[in-house]
């Protein structure tokens, strides 16, 4: 096995193959959107932010625009956390915060029922990253350990972004599976 060292808590031997805590199969748009169905969302913090250059690019908006940032941790069946997710919504949708974490309803669905928004277009980008020190402590991993980052952007019927979620999954806690067939 592999030895993992953590300052202040000693070393431990772990498996060469990490245990996957959550698997998401993707065979249709409906399955993409059901990511939250089997998980529980815990809101850690929310605040109105003004976008800097980096966030403006991610949110496809102007610099210095206001958005509600909601910091969350997602759990699969009360196990270790599977991801840290920052959710960004427009300030006029700030009542969303009072409706999150009550069940497994996806955030875009809650927004839809509260504000009559339809997700007409969803984009998804995945790439490798590393966990920063603040989140690593909460997620129970070493700082700078590898992560899978998934950015989802939800656009309404007017091609306007109404939600962006940036999820950071520590290595071994999430598997994304997709089967495709030529038609």
Task: Give the location of each predicted region.
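HTH-adjacent hinge/linker in prokaryotic transcriptional regulators
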Residues: 1-66, 95-120, 175-183
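Short, catalytically relevant binding-site loops at active-site mouths
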Residues: 50, 75, 88-91
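A general secondary-structure boundary signal
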Residues: 9-11, 85, 161, 165
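Conserved beta-strand segments that form the floor/walls of ligand-binding pockets within enzyme
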Residues: 12, 69, 88, 149
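C-terminal regulatory/effector modules of DNA-binding transcriptional regulators
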Residues: 60-64, 79-80, 90-93, 97-101, ...
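A short glycine-rich, His/Asp/Glu-containing loop-to-beta-strand
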Residues: 41, 69-70, 81-87, 167-169
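Hydrophobic beta-strand positions
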Residues: 73-74, 154
């Amino acid at each position: 096995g592999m030895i993992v060292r953590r300052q202040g808590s000693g070393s431990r031997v772990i498996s060469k193959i990490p245990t996957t805590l959550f698997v998401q199969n993707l065979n249709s748009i409906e399955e993409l959107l059901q990511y939250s169905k089997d998980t529980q969302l815990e809101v850690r913090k929310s605040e109105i932010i003004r976008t800097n250059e980096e966030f403006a690019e991610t949110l496809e908006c102007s610099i210095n625009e206001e958005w509600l940032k909601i910091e969350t941790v997602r759990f699969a069946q009360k196990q270790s956390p599977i991801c840290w997710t920052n959710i960004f919504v427009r300030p006029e949708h700030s009542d969303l915060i009072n409706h999150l974490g009550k069940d497994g309803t996806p955030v875009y669905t809650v927004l839809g029922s509260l504000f009559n928004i339809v997700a007409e277009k969803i984009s998804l980008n995945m790439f490798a990253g590393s966990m920063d020190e603040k989140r690593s402590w909460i997620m129970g991993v070493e700082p700078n350990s590898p992560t899978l980052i998934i950015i989802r952007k939800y656009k309404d019927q007017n091609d306007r972004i109404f939600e962006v979620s940036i999820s950071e999954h520590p290595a071994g806690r999430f598997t994304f599976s997709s089967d495709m067939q030529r038609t």
